[in-house]
Regions:
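Feature marks short, highly hydrophobic, charge-poor N-terminal signal-anchor/signal peptide-like helices
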Residues: 1-10
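Generic signal for short, ordered secondary-structure residues
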Residues: 14-15, 141
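Solvent-exposed, well-ordered amphipathic alpha-helical segments
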Residues: 4, 67-68
């Protein structure tokens, strides 16, 4: 009896983990599919549950995309959802504003002007858009895939927030 318990309990644990992974994958796929229909985007499902999932399209002249991907960190891994809004034209300043709020650019004068015009807007946006990054070509917000992003309306809302920021940046 003890041998059955010693083998059965770990076996049930492993089956439970596999079931949880498959169920979570189905839920995010359904949320992405629904969000893509709402936004009018194209959805590319992944056959493999560990591969990147992506929806993309255009809103008001801005190419947008949402990616769900897993990044390994040694023995553990984290799944992220990343929202991109690409500017119709690049600023071509070598501009980089990372998620910590650190600014960098090739042309210091132009970069300083850009920062002065947009600093308050970006700082305010960082409250809603975690890990916010702004570069010459795009605005990006990356978040850990929590339960709320299994809902299509949260994906749509965050994509629209990222797009609104991209439109407001001058």
């Amino acid at each position: 009896m003890e041998k059955v318990i010693a083998i059965g309990v770990p076996g049930l644990f492993i089956v439970g983990i596999i079931w949880l992974i498959i169920t979570s994958n189905k839920r995010i796929n359904n949320a992405l599919s629904t969000a893509s229909k709402t936004l009018g985007f194209t959805y590319i499902p992944s056959k493999n549950i560990f591969r990147k999932k992506k929806i993309f399209g255009e809103i008001d002249g801005y190419n947008c995309e949402v990616e769900v991907y897993t990044r390994s960190h040694g023995k553990s891994s984290t799944t992220y959802v990343s929202f991109f809004a690409y500017f119709p034209e690049s600023f071509e300043m070598g501009l980089k504003i990372n998620w910590r709020g650190e600014f960098d650019g090739d042309d210091e004068y132009l970069t300083d002007l850009f920062i002065k015009r947009n600093e308050e807007l970006i700082e305010t946006s960082k409250k809603n858009l975690r890990r916010l990054r702004v570069e010459d070509a795009f605005v990006n917000s990356r978040k850990v895939l929590f339960r709320k992003y299994y809902k299509a309306d949260e994906i749509v809302k965050t994509m629209r927030d990222v797009l609104s920021l991209a439109k407001a940046i001058k």
